[in-house]
């Protein structure tokens, strides 16, 4: 019988860097996490995962089976470099090919959710044409994901195009497809001028996972928990009362820290204490 406890995961980039997934999942298990979210970012090293051999993919699956720690989601931020909204046809084609490979990879190793970055373009100036291309590229991507039974979920971003659940819901309603959903980041959501609790309630029924991090206005990464503007307890209470029972993912970038495991353990305890205050988990 499946446990009724809240699934709590950790982002790959919070743990020591490297390509040994057995070691990474063993560490995550030691730290008390249920799952790890894989990163496929714009670096050549992480992009190369999409070209893993059958044996490399099987090694990941075996590590999951051996440890009991799942890898149910992928953070696909490679589209910063190869955006679906690019006005350069070659770059956009690369972006669509990355999407195709990511969906195939997910299908092969059991990843259920691919979190998408809501940028039409990142390093270029946006305009109406980049947004049209982005929307059309997403439509094509959702069609691919539907055939593979892999969910594409839009992150709430550090970027105006997708900085609220309301904006992401516009795309969800436009596509009207069960394989396109939302993956809000309560840190990003709180850093903008949003009514955070109303936004979270508006997304219920479309939220498949939640990123947990702290932020400040204009500062979206590496804000220590408790030093930013996020009202974690209220966010957790709102999600619980709205009926959300899905996973939470602590997002950190401590892979190059002197002691990543210690940093992660500290963050885990801090987040779980706020969850306990919100009535989501038992107090330690």
UniProtKB/Swiss-Prot annotation:
Q: GO terms for molecular function, please?
A: intramolecular oxidoreductase activity, interconverting aldoses and ketoses; L-ribulose-5-phosphate 3-epimerase activity
Supply the InterPro entries for this chain.
L-Ru-5P_3-Epase, L-Ru-5P_3-Epase_Enterobacteria, Sugar_Epim/Isomerase, Xyl_isomerase-like_sf, Xyl_isomerase-like_TIM-brl
What triggers expression? Induced by L-ascorbate. Repressed by UlaR.
UniProt pathway annotation = Cofactor degradation; L-ascorbate degradation; D-xylulose 5-phosphate from L-ascorbate: step 3/4
Annotated keywords: Isomerase
**Family the UniProt entry places it in:** Belongs to the L-ribulose-5-phosphate 3-epimerase family.
The record's section on HAMAP family has: UlaE
Protein name per UniProt = L-ribulose-5-phosphate 3-epimerase UlaE
According to its UniProt entry, this protein's organism is: Escherichia coli O1:K1 / APEC
Q: Report the gene name.
A: ulaE
């Amino acid at each position: 019988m499946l446990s009724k406890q809240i699934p709590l995961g950790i982002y790959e980039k919070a743990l020591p860097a490297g390509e040994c997934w057995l070691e990474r999942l063993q560490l995550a298990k030691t730290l008390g996490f249920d799952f790890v979210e894989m990163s496929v970012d714009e670096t050549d090293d992480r992009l190369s995962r999409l070209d893993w051999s059958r044996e490399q993919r099987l090694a990941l699956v075996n590590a999951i089976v051996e440890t009991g720690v799942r890898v149910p989601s992928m953070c696909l931020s490679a589209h910063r470099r190869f955006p679906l909204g690019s006005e350069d046809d070659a770059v956009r084609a690369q972006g669509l090919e990355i999407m195709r490979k990511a969906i195939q990879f997910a299908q092969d190793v059991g990843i259920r959710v691919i979190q998408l970055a809501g940028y039409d373009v990142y390093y270029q100036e946006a305009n109406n044409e980049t947004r049209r291309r982005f929307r059309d590229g997403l439509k094509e991507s959702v069609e691919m994901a539907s055939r593979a039974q892999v969910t594409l979920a839009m992150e709430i971003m550090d970027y105006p195009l997708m900085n609220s659940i309301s904006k992401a819901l516009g795309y969800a309603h436009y596509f009207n497809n069960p394989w396109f959903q939302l993956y809000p980041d309560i840190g990003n959501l709180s850093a903008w001028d949003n009514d955070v609790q109303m936004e979270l309630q508006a997304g219920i029924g479309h939220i498949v996972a939640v990123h947990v991090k702290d932020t400040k206005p204009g500062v979206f990464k590496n804000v220590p928990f408790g030093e930013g503007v996020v009202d974690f307890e209220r966010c957790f209470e709102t999600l619980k009362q709205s009926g959300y029972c899905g996973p939470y993912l602590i997002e950190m970038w401590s892979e190059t820290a002197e002691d990543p495991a210690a940093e992660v353990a500290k963050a885990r305890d801090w987040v779980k204490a706020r969850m306990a205050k919100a009535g989501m988990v038992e107090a330690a």
